[in-house]
Amino acid sequence: MRADPAQCRLRQTGDVDPADGDGRRCHRRSPAYCGVRSGPGGCRHRYLISSLVSACLGFYYVHRVAHLTCRVSLKNLSGDIRNIGRTALPAVIGNLATPVGMAYVMAAMAPFGSQALATIGVIDRVIQVAFCVVFALPGALIPILGQNLGAMNTARVSQAIKMTYGLLIGYGSVTSLLLILLAEPLASLFHLAAERQVVFFAFCRWGGALDAHRAAIHCHLSLPQYGATGVRHTVRLVPRHLGTMPFVWYGAHKFGSVGVMLGQLLGNTIVAFCACVARASAHEKDVGHRDPFNREPIPPQE
């Protein structure tokens, strides 16, 4: 079969003009992208187009379908901003912790070469896949807890949390064992260089257990808590900074690239555990065991 000249050029240069080849190529792509060049230059234009289309569709459904828009009242705007800011500002600050901590890890790993940076990228992808269940748990658990907290059914809330921690322990143990057993096949799958397999093997053999514990703490810190919004996001911020920078700096100077990776995981685990203790103490002091809204408990339905 004769090769398409446009496909050959794509393999050689990575850039194909949409007019090259037959006209069916344009129909195999989204009509909105017709006329947009491929390659790095076209990617940013495609991203801009898709973002604009998504924003317009979102506004249409919010305004015309859900009818959630209204005229802005300057009289009530300042009060609404203050009320929203009490929760939104700590959340924004807490969410800045992960990119800042990861940037420091990348800066510490950069002196060890591009292969070391590539290994950290592989480890990050493996973590996202291996512990995907743990990272999805808060989003699945919060609606259940919110419904039962609203009904003052604390027994069911306690049962759900206990079952969650049991699942985390079992899932984390099995995942850590699988990482140990599959360390070499995974390294071959990602085509890691021989000198950088040491970092990946260290993660699979030691970092898996540390990250399982850290992921469990991540799930705990993501759970809602009345009266302690600022504390909750503060203790999410502290582990990513205090638990990253000193440990990564020491590990890089003493153990090289392996020390950077293990220092990050060990530091996050230690400081996150201390942050959980501080969060629990602050919650007991601020709220205790009473309902902050002074509601009467709703009897369970038969």
Swiss-Prot record:
Presence of the UniProt keyword Transport in the record: yes
Gene Ontology terms: cellular component: plasma membrane
One GO MF term: antiporter activity
Top-level taxon of origin: Bacteria
InterPro entries, per the entry: MATE_fam, MATE_MdtK
Keywords: Plasmid, Transport
General function of this protein: May be a membrane-bound protein, possibly involved in IAA or IAA-Lysine transport.
Protein name per the record: Uncharacterized 21 kDa protein in iaaL 5'region
